[in-house]
Amino acid sequence: MSASPIDQILGAIQRPTIDRPFGVHLWPIFDKAFTAIKGYHPQDFDFQPHVTPMSTMKETAALIFTYYVVIFGGRELMRNRPAFKLNGPFMIHNFYLTAISGILLALFTEELIPTLYNKGLFFAICDVKGGWTNHLVILYYLNYLTKYLELIDTVFLVLKKKPLTFLHCYHHGATALLCYTQLIGLTSVSWVPITLNLMVHVVMYWYYFQSARGIRIWWKEWITRLQIIQFVIDLVFVYFASYTYFTSTYFKWMPNAGQCAGEEFAAFAGMGIISSYLLLFISFYIATYKKDGKRPTGRKAARSLKDAELPDIAAITQGKIQPAKKANGNAAAATPGRVTRSRKA
């Protein structure tokens, strides 16, 4: 009697090593699945900027623009309609994003540990043979495509008539753009923010999957903490890689570690977008989890900003939003009660 595929995999598991950190080689398993779907081996994938699907700025901009049209148009369509429950589809959405993130993270880990151990950190983040191998490029590309799946997060918010906040909408659109710029920019340091992001997403989407099941989990606050830690580490690596690139290229008299692979526009995009994430998520954390102190601070302002919905265009054009009236020399306007919510449904 022949063994089942699961028995074969379990039988192949050996003691973990540097080249086989999980006790079994994951790439051959991924190779079989990828080949069955695409008809060719993943290592034969040839990413060509402006040729490979979704590798042009026009395509990326069109999809991001469509995303914003859909969510804001959808909000208008849902204005006088009851909210959908969608608990089942929401559970499925969060479960498959948890699974995808976990699988990609495991594949990245298997590829990177031998490089880090044998060649060192600088080689892994700055040399094309370290951070831009054929195996890593296909993983970068697949990770980039998942950013468009994650846009469905906001569609659930719209259909469930949840508020659309600036942080949520900006973060989702900007992340798709960020992954595009790094993929086109051939930045070998990309694996650092990507693997950290995948790790956070495994935790985050699993949390929301369990929440949709009605299970209360106490560590929700730690998701935002992990995101902030992620952005800090990202910026350390991205700023270092950018610094050593620019100094070794244009300011050779300054201390530097040598050349670092990647395009200049990708460096500026990475530094700018991730820096904005750090500032926004710190503000979100303070506004959501830190109580106001006795002394006046910026926390109340941060909380107001965090809870504010994005402008309602229909209400503005129809003249339903009136300018604030002044009373006793201070601007005062009637506002609805705050709606506290996280960045997810």
Predicted features along the sequence, with ranges:
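Surface-exposed charge patches
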Residues: Y208
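Membrane-helix and juxtamembrane interface regions of eukaryotic multi-pass membrane proteins
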Residues: M1-P193, S211, I215-I229, I233-R338, ...
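Generic alpha-helical transmembrane segments
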Residues: T195-Y205
